[in-house]
Amino acid sequence: AASAVASASKSQPTPAISQFYSVVREETRGLPDRTVYRPADLKAVGPDVPVIVWANGGCRHANVFFATALSLLSARGFIVIADGAPEAVSTLSTAGGAQPQRMTEVIDWVTKSKDAKKQFDGRASGTRIAVIGQSCGGIEALVAGADPRVDSVVSVNSGLFANGALGYGRDRLNELHSPVLFIHGGPEAIEYQNSVENYALVDGPAALVGAVGAGHAGIFYGIRDNTQDGTIAVLEEGVTVLVQWFDYTLNGNSAAKAYFTDPSGLSSVPKWTVETKGLQP
């Protein structure tokens, strides 16, 4: 896939973070057990809408737990295709582990299927595609990210294990060819060490972002510092991180890249940390 980062035009696109579209949640036509989150009026977004493939935590084929975050992400001008049917609540993987091939199946469907072309009125991009996942889904994304059609990879509260747990070792990181974002929930989160060590092992462009106090899934549930009543700010801030990352890596918006590299960006937001290496203009 052509890298939007490498081919960004001199005229920057309208920042994705400043856009907000009504969102439709629907099934995928001709592809079982997936859910589409998309702007209701794709024509208003443009002729080539970036595609984000999502994998859930717990190796589950159910995305309802992440519906709020995925809807808010899609509202910024992205087609998000998540594992699990719209009505699925808690469907475990029948294979008992990570299944990154389910992400590449979605990419195949988007780029080759007549059903997908019809569902998106030919507006789903086949050259601006990202993979992202939470926990087990992050492992799936890191493995699926080796696919040459992938332009951006995000691992949320995850990372490949040194012992190859869930079937994939850290050698897989050598196969990544596009920018990678690792997000963790702070030093006390169970995935923290994995995220930090994976980031260190990646040779290419990458960012390591921490939502201090959010724990293993707080940025999706709006929970920080173990509060039971929720801290909705961390959900909004987490979605902003994702929107800025995809605006940079899929849309080629250098202003979005600055959110990760400039002192006035994410590093100025309370209880967030950021480290980057090799991010291109």
At which residue positions do the language-model features occur?
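Short amphipathic alpha-helix adjacent to the substrate-entry channel of hydrolases
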Residues: 63-83
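N-terminal cap/lid segment of alpha/beta-hydrolase-fold proteins
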Residues: 4-47
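Gly/Ser-rich "nucleophile elbow"/oxyanion-hole loop immediately N-terminal to the catalytic nucleophile
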Residues: 41-48, 92-139, 255
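Hydrolases whose catalytic domains are alpha/beta-hydrolase-1, hotdog thioesterase
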Residues: 140-144
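Hydrophobic beta-strand anchors of alpha/beta hydrolase catalytic cores
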Residues: 52-54, 80, 208
